Amino acid sequence: MPLSYQHFRKLLLLDNEAGPLEEELPRLADEDLNRRVAEDLNLGNLNVSIPWTHKVGNFTGLYSSSVPVFNPHWKTPSFPNIHLHQDIIKKCEQFVGPLTVNEKRRLKLIMPARFYPNFTKYLPLDKGIKPYYPEHLVNHYFHTRHYLHTLWKAGILYKRVSTHSASFCGSPYSWEQELQHGAESFHQQSSGILSRPSVGSSLQSKHQQSRLGLQSQQGHLARRQQGRSWSIRTRVHPTARRPSGVEPSGSGHNANLASKSASCLYQSTVRTAAYPAVSTSENHSSSGHAVELHNLPPNSARSQSERPVSPCWWLQFRNSKPCSDYCLSHIVNLLEDWGPCAEHGEHHIRIPRTPARVTGGVFLVDKNPHNTAESRLVVDFSQFSRGNYRVSWPKFAVPNLQSLTNLLSSNLCWLSLDVSAAFYHLPLHPAAMPHLLVGSSGLSRYVARLSSNSRIINHQHGTLQNLHDSCSRNLYVSLLLLYKTFGWKLHLYSHPIILGFRKIPMGVGLSPFLLAQFTSAICSVVRRAFPHCLAFSYMDDVVLGAKSVQHLESLFTAVTNFLLSLGIHLNPNKTKRWGYSLNFMGYVIGSWGSLPQDHIRHKIKECFRKLPVHRPIDWKVCQRIVGLLGFAAPFTQCGYPALMPLYACIQSKQAFTFSPTYKAFLCKQYLNLYPVARQRPGLCQVFADATPTGWGLVMGHQRMRGTFSAPLPIHTAELLAACFARSRSGANILGTDNSVVLSRKYTSFPWLLGCAANWILRGTSFVYVPSALNPADDPSRGRLGPCRPLLHLPFRPTTGRTSLYADSPSVPSHLPDRVHFASPLHVAWRPP
């Protein structure tokens, strides 16, 4: 007869009808009993012949591919002009006085952030935009290009202009100006860009002029050089490799004039009329001469001055005869002026050698499950986390639940701030650019590669027949619809482009570490500036606590102004005021302790409602169930040990079958959640110790000892002794010399004992006592002779390694009606 739920509860000592604990509890460590219970509850029978279940409620398992949903009406989020001030350390020091070593070290890490991968694999441009939505290829292509363009305009990306130069928008940092080559550095102006052409540039322009025969253009460019902020950055360069003294591969715009002016030059009268200021040689494809040059006959660069060529794929359709009703020439003829082939950044800098390749693909998804109107760019730089050359990312401390509760469970009033686009605040050094490249090979290549009738193999790239190969009804209809959204930008986005990250990207394991360092340092500064308040952060989630609502509001104003003065962008619409119970990291934290948020409790309820019994569930689904239940496990009676059978099945990659008793047990566990309370400091007066054969307790001046009916493993014996001490004395601070008991992880003990011990020791704090000093050592060995002196062992609750560098003074418990003028806000705060 299988074990009923009622019997199981009694067995686990969850009911009060059990006999004396000293007799009952050691039974639960018995291997034979554990095996029988596992058989009764069907926990160990992992090999089943019935087919596995691969879906439970919203949890999907093996062999299920969730089809991503494309939204043609996605809005690209706007990015404010984010520019974190470079002198952030100086500004913090003005605000709060000298920074601690810890704060300085953390802030230096991100000014600028550096990225040193062991090895970088370059992928062809065709792989720049992933074909993530096969039904909506063209639509997805343009939305992604628009997103990338928005990021470039916001100063978050560099655009590769040539092998050694890049352009960007926004305010430059000093390291983007101090660009050195060899032993000499450039002479900087305030804008960080050379304003005077150097010797090399005039030499080089002569050199190119004689080679190309582009007199008229060269003269025009030479005249314009003086006024441009980004004149040519080449100069006499004495190295053994180039005895001529000229650096032909220079970073300037004219360096590859032959290929560039040829690559995307379009001489229509419309353009010259509409954009007289933009010289034709400036209209080259940023990055893409390597890709687009195939459209030219071999001698075209030389014959440039004799006859106009329009090799731009998009504009070639203007002069060609429509091949059908769905020919792209119909769309190209909709507009007289399609704008420039490439836009130019406000600043140009020299960068390390960057190939015309990408290092990761991008695609779009919903911004989050609650916001499907906006898109989010997913960047796949997973190459740096895989394979033999993977980078081991730095670890950083995240507070566990108990530390978080100790820190934040108080009678404070809370609000949380939302940092908009937090990752994009932290600048990356330009040397990281060659490793973090995204981009696309342009629409023509993208369509040709993905269309089945692609005839791109025969290398007749210049022929008109080949131009019309890409015309199709699908492409025509998609472009017509996109024309309404993007207008003239269709032309801009149809060109190849290569972009590198100027701020830290989300798809690299280094980014969360850097963000955590940054926000924790800023919160540390805020805590010291306002000693009676608490500021705490986890990644981009920043919370402020103060002892009354009025105090909190004035703190909010002061902190917001401080953060804005550093260049940190807050999203005022997403500031949430929580009152006295804070919602943070999935928990509700109040003066009574922490509990999971309501939406998580609701998910758990739904999960149990849909959980089948007597049906083998695929281990991947079990993994997802355990993920959800594991989050709330610390709030249940038996905690993590109750989930051990599920963990075992996941580890062996087998199916798990829920028996009605085990399901009822878990259901009951998760129906009543108990808060995890804040630990209080105190003095340890109860000590426990054990040997494999006996146990001993010391409670004040009272001593007890007992023996086990059979020898037990030492850790099991120590755990039993701790349970006896707790139940006998009721003390919530115990002294023990066993590190496993101290760690409070009872998952490696016999299953039944782990569950029962978790319930008995819930809310107990442990203090480590070295064996030699443990007063319970003698009783555990059966000696009740002269008593060892009781230790004076204080217990201090820990906040983990969340390094509150400056301890905040304790907050008085009374709540004033309003903020007094002698409030800590006015005493401690000095204007920046």
From Swiss-Prot:
Residues 178-335 are annotated as: Spacer. Its EC number is 2.7.7.7, 2.7.7.49, 3.1.26.4. Gene3D superfamilies: 3.30.70.270, HIV Type 1 Reverse Transcriptase, subunit A, domain 1 (3.10.10.10). It holds the Pfam family DNA_pol_viral_N. The keyword tRNA processing does not apply. Residues 336-679 are annotated as: Polymerase/reverse transcriptase domain (RT). Disulfide bonds: none annotated. It catalyses: DNA(n) + a 2'-deoxyribonucleoside 5'-triphosphate = DNA(n+1) + diphosphate; Endonucleolytic cleavage to 5'-phosphomonoester. Residues 186-206 have a biased composition (Polar residues). Residues 1-177 are annotated as: Terminal protein domain (TP). Belongs to the hepadnaviridae P protein family. Hepadnaviral virions contain probably just one P protein molecule per particle. This is Protein P. It comes from Hepatitis B virus genotype D subtype ayw (isolate Australia/AustKW/1991). The lineage of its organism: Viruses, Riboviria, Pararnavirae, Artverviricota, Revtraviricetes.
